[in-house]
């Protein structure tokens, strides 16, 4: 995100059956930093925000039929959150594993120069983490993989 508070940005929101537990777990497992927690009169979580670098993640409770945890949907994910690290992806994966994440894909270097892993959180959300290991020009992976890279379809 920009230093300009009015600059446009993209944030993700994830929903949990137990968002309070999720906040604690996401901090422990992935290193996300809580930045705002709003509770209602009964002490239930109304809204929360976490930061990771310049990124914003909102963590909330299930609040409609269209805002559900993967756990409530039989483990179905319609999207994942990708988090790009600057360094330490293997250690990050081990941290997540120690916190109880199921590692769906061990750290592996991809054809485009990033090393990635995938993890499942306690309520079934899939998280992908990446770190650029080698800066590669698209022409390099096109040649190696037989792919075509362009800006638009």
Language-model regions: role of each:
Residues 123:
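C-terminal catalytic core of tyrosine-transesterase DNA break-rejoin enzymes
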Residues 16-20:
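Short acidic-aromatic low-complexity motifs
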Residues 1-13, 23-24, 30-120, 130-153:
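Vicinal oxygen chelate
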């Amino acid at each position: 995100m920009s230093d300009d508070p009015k600059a446009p940005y993209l944030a993700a929101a994830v929903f949990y059956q137990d968002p309070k537990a999720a906040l604690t777990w996401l901090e422990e497992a992935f290193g996300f930093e809580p930045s705002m927690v709003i509770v209602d009169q009964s002490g239930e979580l109304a809204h929360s925000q976490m930061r990771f670098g310049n990124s914003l993640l909102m963590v909330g409770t299930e609040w409609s039929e269209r805002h559900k945890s993967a756990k409530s949907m039989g483990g179905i994910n319609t999207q994942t959150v990708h988090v790009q690290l600057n360094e330490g992806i293997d250690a990050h994966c081990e941290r997540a594993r120690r916190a109880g994440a199921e590692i769906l894909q061990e750290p592996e270097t991809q054809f485009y120069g990033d090393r990635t892993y995938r993890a499942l959180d306690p309520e079934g959300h899939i998280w992908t983490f990446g770190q650029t290991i080698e800066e590669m020009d698209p022409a390099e992976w096109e040649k190696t993989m037989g792919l075509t890279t362009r800006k638009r379809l």
